[in-house]
Amino acid sequence: MEFLLDSANPEEIRQAWAMGVIGGITTNPSLVAKEGRDFHQLLQELVQIVNGPISAEVIALDTEGMLGEARELAAMHPNIVVKIPMTEEGLKAVKVLKAEGIKTNVTLVFSAVQALLAARAGATYVSPFLGRLDDIGENGLLLLADICEVFGVHGLETKVIAASIRNPVHVTEAAKIGADYATVPFNVLCQLFKHPLTEAGIKKFLADWQKLK
């Protein structure tokens, strides 16, 4: 399983990229709005930081509007992946974009059959949202397992991105289930490096070393 960073903050992205563990980033309108900057100018900065897929989402809800935005985004840089919402209009757009060679990430997926439809429409990636399902008392990891099983049974090439990651347990379980990617917020990524026994071990090694002096 590969890691993506779920962020539109250039400083977070620089730090995460320097760690050497992420292969790309995902953004959404909410993350971009937090930055308070022009969307296209922000993307132009991000493609200079990360040499990997960068998911950028359309705002339009109709097929033609999505196609117009998608083509504009894709023309900015070869690494741009266009995020499309999981709707009927969205899947119509995905089919056209697939034929045009534009990569897509179908987002806001909350059922295995939605993921299957997206794959059949030609999506490059699908993004099931784990945390948001957990929030309403459902099991996001079970959804992820169902999607990975269905895709495996039918030999689908669409890649699965575990999204709406809330904690390190989500990351571990996503890897065990077989997700192709996990897109993690910066705070969760930082948590993955830490373990109390690692920190205690470092302190002990240093203390023992000091005794030699």
From Swiss-Prot:
EC id: 2.2.1.2
Family indicated by similarity: Belongs to the transaldolase family. Type 3B subfamily.
GO biological process: carbohydrate metabolic process; pentose-phosphate shunt
The entry's keywords: Cytoplasm, Pentose shunt, Schiff base, Transferase
Catalytic activity annotation: D-sedoheptulose 7-phosphate + D-glyceraldehyde 3-phosphate = D-erythrose 4-phosphate + beta-D-fructose 6-phosphate
UniProt-listed PANTHER family: TRANSALDOLASE
Subcellular localization, as worded in the UniProt entry: Cytoplasm
Active site feature: 83 (schiff-base intermediate with substrate)
Protein name per its UniProtKB record: Probable transaldolase
HAMAP family in UniProt: Transaldolase_3b
Pathway: Carbohydrate degradation; pentose phosphate pathway; D-glyceraldehyde 3-phosphate and beta-D-fructose 6-phosphate from D-ribose 5-phosphate and D-xylulose 5-phosphate (non-oxidative stage): step 2/3
